[in-house]
Amino acid sequence: MGKFFTPYALIIFVFLIQACSSPSKTIFEGVRMTIPYRVVLGETLSFSQKKQAQKEIDQIFDHIDQIFNNWNPFSEISRINRSETLEPISLSPELFSFLCEIDRFHTFSDGRFDPTLGALKNLWLLHLKSQTLPPQELLHSYKQNTGWHLLSLDKTNHTLKKLSPSVQLDLCGAVKGFAVDLLGIFCSQFCQNYYVEWGGEIKTSGKHPSGRSWAIASSATPEILHLNNSSIATSGNQYQRWYVNKKIYTHILDPLTGIPLEESSYPILAVSVIDENCAFADAMATALTTFTSKQEALDWAKKKHLCVYITDKNAS
């Protein structure tokens, strides 16, 4: 996860304007899995409360790292990816619950959000960084092992079954948003007003300590967005790009083709999605980048009743 998200492809700024009376708040900041986080509570905590709160924040990130982090070789998801068994694999309650959500995201996105592209994506990145393209035979082999249909969730026994031994999961497209949702649940134990951000995915509740709405700037729109009790996630391709054979490729793969988005065919630069659920917004922002035009993406979002902001190469 660390390497995958490191170039903060989705840089979103929050403007926390200080009132003259220095409104009551407590701030937690740090870096986890190479990604900066910021948590703002609209209450002043005592020293002991702040110490305990920091401990619980660390535990949430440890939880994400130990279960969902593809870059941690000892995580649960990494162990599943290494397994080539076709027998049912027992899942932790946390991973099973999240995979059920992933199943919902995949269906809702009409297959445009596909968490089985990890191995294929790594193959492409390995070659693009070397200014080459993968051999067609190798691409065909990897593509055969992608697709959500190659996984089966048993909702009675809480197990996962691979229908192909080589299929792998990469949950990076939604797990940052999921972590932000978990941090939001934690914050709600202390106060109604809070702001959580991890690497560009944001969740807000109530108001800023000064009494105004939370003011958010997104790379997907020139507008300043004012959020209350909602989340925003942004996906974009303008920060990881490679020039190979007179074409510009990005780090996002089109699940329908298995090929990285190529600038001349995919003009969308950034997408922000607003929703109560940050994991859902995260997944849908990724899905919306795979459309071949801004209008096509907007039409799909309207049909799905999504609140979105999109910018393309025309900066429109």
Swiss-Prot record:
Please report the record's description of how this protein sits within the membrane.
Answer: Lipid-anchor
Tell me which GO cellular component terms the UniProt record holds: plasma membrane
> Where is the protein found, in the record's own terms?
Cell inner membrane
- Any idea which positions bind Mg(2+)? 173, 282, 286
* Lipid-bearing positions (S-diacylglycerol cysteine): 20
Q: Which residues bind FAD per the record?
A: 33, 71, 112-114, 170, 176, 253
Leader peptide range in chain numbering:
1-19
The molecule here is called FAD:protein FMN transferase
This protein's source sits in the domain of life called Bacteria
Name any cofactors this protein relies on.
Mg(2+)
Q: Which reaction does it catalyse?
A: L-threonyl-[protein] + FAD = FMN-L-threonyl-[protein] + AMP + H(+)
Q: Which family does it belong to?
A: Belongs to the ApbE family.
Q: Which SUPFAM superfamilies match?
A: ApbE-like (SSF143631)
Q: What class of enzyme is it?
A: transferase
The EC number(s) this enzyme carries: 2.7.1.180
What is the organism of origin for this protein? Chlamydia muridarum (strain MoPn / Nigg)
Sites of N-palmitoyl cysteine lipid linkage? 20
User: In the UniProt record, does the keyword Membrane occur?
Assistant: yes
Any Pfam family hit: ApbE
- One GO MF term: metal ion binding
